[in-house]
A protein has these predicted regions:
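Cytoplasmic helix-loop-helix junction between adjacent transmembrane helices
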Residues: 105-142
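Helix-loop-helix hairpin linking two adjacent transmembrane segments in secondary transporters
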Residues: 130, 139-185
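A late C-terminal transmembrane helix in Major Facilitator Superfamily
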Residues: 326-357
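C-terminal transmembrane helical hairpin of 12-TM major facilitator-type secondary transporters
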Residues: 268-317
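Structural signature of the two symmetry-related core transmembrane helices
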Residues: 77-92, 275-290, 368
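Central cavity-lining transmembrane alpha-helices of secondary-active solute carriers
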Residues: 54-67, 251-263
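Conserved MFS/SLC helix-loop-helix module at the cytosolic interface between two early adjacent transmembrane helices
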Residues: 61-99
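Extracytoplasmic gate region of multi-pass secondary transporters
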Residues: 31-32, 209-261
Length: 390
């Protein structure tokens, strides 16, 4: 492959992986809208219902292992198979005769989800050449849109077929995998196969200068994200007493988040990864503080700013991880995604606990102040590596 080809942005390939991300994540978002029906069908307690989501996310703990494996085989295999291997268990949720089968189906879907999300950014990075940020933005937009459309698809399927009979929707996932196989067999890069016998520990040692500051950024950013993504409708309802406004606030936050995701990666190709993260993680705490303290249309504008800046950080961090991967691109992404999962899971519980003690308004102010603490860790991130470096 020529140097020019490596530098080219392969639009068709990047769009194909983004479409795969969209289709895959539509299926993986089925659980939340189906949960009330599953609770009723199987007479589940709320504790059992909550554990279903946890079981689906447990495989995220082995993301580094999946990445380690993906660096040794062709990453196309994971990406081509993922839509069907996630579609099948998620489409069978309504058929599950008991809680144990439900747990098995969701754990299988969680494994498939990890097996897609760890290597997919590696392929996007290869297809994006020198414009990795732009590639990651397009890839992440597919996932963000799926989170909006997926619940509607699940409800529509159950409305038409009924809960026990909506399983034929898995066919779309199967067709998507066949389509991806046809596309990537012809045009995709083979994926970098790591032939060395290095261990996961070796991979961590080579990546820790990147992962330690990134982990700290994920934690401090996580307080802001956990506060808003989980408790925004509750906060707005407490402030205004208007449930319609509460729901609309989350839609505004997510919509401007999608815009941020779509634009931030390309911005980081021109401004640099660290500079873009600095802009985002100065803008987000300022926006959250102002949102909490103001009223009326100014508050709406501050929510837009917060959504745009806070959610825009993910494609930039994905591009940064791939640039710094040092021959272990999937392992690097596996570590990043594991840290992201751990930070997100733990912090939502902490945010809920603080909100019980101090109220949501004070929790939002505290989260914004903690968000500012991410800034020194952004300055600790390694700079852009030269193409020839190893």
């Amino acid at each position: 492959v020529s140097e020019r080809k490596k530098a080219d942005f392969q639009t068709a390939g990047v769009l194909a992986v983004a479409v795969a991300h969209f289709i895959h994540d539509v299926y993986s978002s089925f659980l939340a809208p189906l949960l009330p029906l599953l609770i009723e069908k199987l007479s589940l307690t709320l504790t059992q219902a909550g554990f279903l989501s946890t079981v689906m996310q447990i495989p995220a703990l082995i993301n580094p292992l999946i990445g380690h494996l993906a660096d040794r085989v062709n990453v196309r295999i994971f990406i081509v198979l993922a839509p069907v291997t996630t579609a099948v268990p998620m489409s069978l949720l309504g058929v599950a005769p008991n809680y144990a089968v439900l747990l098995i189906l969701l754990f299988a879907a969680g494994l498939s989800t990890s097996a897609f999300h760890v290597p997919a950014p590696v392929m996007v990075a290869e297809l994006s050449g020198s414009r990795k940020g732009r590639g990651m933005s397009i890839f992440m937009t597919g996932g963000e849109l799926a989170r909006t459309v997926g619940p509607l698809c699940a409800v529509a399927a159950v409305s038409v077929f009924g809960l026990p009979r909506f399983y034929p929707v898995m066919v779309v996932g199967g067709l998507a995998s066949i389509w991806l196989f046809a596309i990537f067999r012809r045009s995709a890069p083979p994926g970098k196969v790591q032939s060395s016998r290095s261990s996961i520990l070796d991979s961590w040692r080579s990546l820790q200068k990147l992962m330690l500051p990134l982990g700290a950024i994920l934690v401090f950013r996580g307080f802001m994200h956990g506060s808003l993504a989980t408790f925004l409708p509750t906060f707005v309802n407490q402030e205004t007493g208007n449930i319609w406004l509460a729901g609309s606030a989350l839609t505004v936050f997510e919509a401007f988040g999608v815009a941020g995701v779509l634009l931030a990666g390309s911005m980081s190709d021109h401004l640099g990864r660290r500079n873009t993260l600095l802009i985002s993680l100065i803008g987000a705490p300022v926006g959250l503080l102002a949102f909490t303290l103001t009223e009326g249309w100014l508050r709406v504008a501050m929510l837009m700013l917060t959504g745009f800046t806070l959610l825009s950080t993910t494609p930039v961090m994905l591009a940064l991880v791939q640039e710094q991967a040092r021959g272990r691109p999937a392992a690097a992404n596996g570590f990043f995604m594991m840290l992201s999962f751990l930070a997100r899971s733990a912090i939502v519980v902490v945010v809920g606990y603080v909100a019980d003690l101090a109220g949501l308004r004070n929790t939002y102010l505290l989260s914004a102040c903690l968000g500012i603490l991410a800034i020194p860790f952004i300055l600790m991130l390694p700079g852009k590596r030269q193409p020839g470096s190893s």
